[in-house]
Amino acid sequence: MTEIKGLGGMLNGFRDLVKDAESITFVGTPGFCTPFAEFLAFPIRDKKLAFVPNLKIEKTRKMVATEYGMELGDATSPDADVVVILGGMAMPKIGVSIEEMADLLGKIEHKKLIGVCFMGILEQAGWCGTPALGFDYVMNTTLMGDISGE
């Protein structure tokens, strides 16, 4: 197990996990997961990147670097060296089952599967350690903070 600290540690840790990959596809919920996929994609923007919204493989879009940062672009294939499942997919209110995710993964050619989540949601949802998904790595980050003021 490798400990990561802060956002920089998260980015560096993720970049290390995918350093040998030429292409990475993120699977996540629109809105909630999209900015995290863009955040993780920025330091690896020289690779072929894609985003699958929810389980809608037909809506896969390229992730492209622009003067504004990472943005979704034209339609593309979801096939990649690495597929990254973002934790929002495992949140109860999203309603994606392990079986549905496994079915989606069966439609995407990939060599490695990585889970990226906050606050242990992939483990809480029972997605870690299940043969149906078979994560090669899971990156979990715990967020803590405070608000000060009046």
Regions found by a protein language model. Give the residues of each.
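Gly/Ser/Thr-rich loops at beta-strand to alpha-helix junctions
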Residues: 7, 26-38, 56, 88-94, ...
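Long, hydrophobic N-terminal alpha-helical segment
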Residues: 1-50
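Short linear motifs at secondary-structure transitions and domain/linker junctions
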Residues: 1-3, 27, 58-62, 90, ...
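A generic local structural motif
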Residues: 11-12, 70-72, 100-103
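Glycine-rich, aromatic-bearing surface loops/beta-hairpins
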Residues: 78, 82, 86-150
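Long, charge-dense
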Residues: 36-93
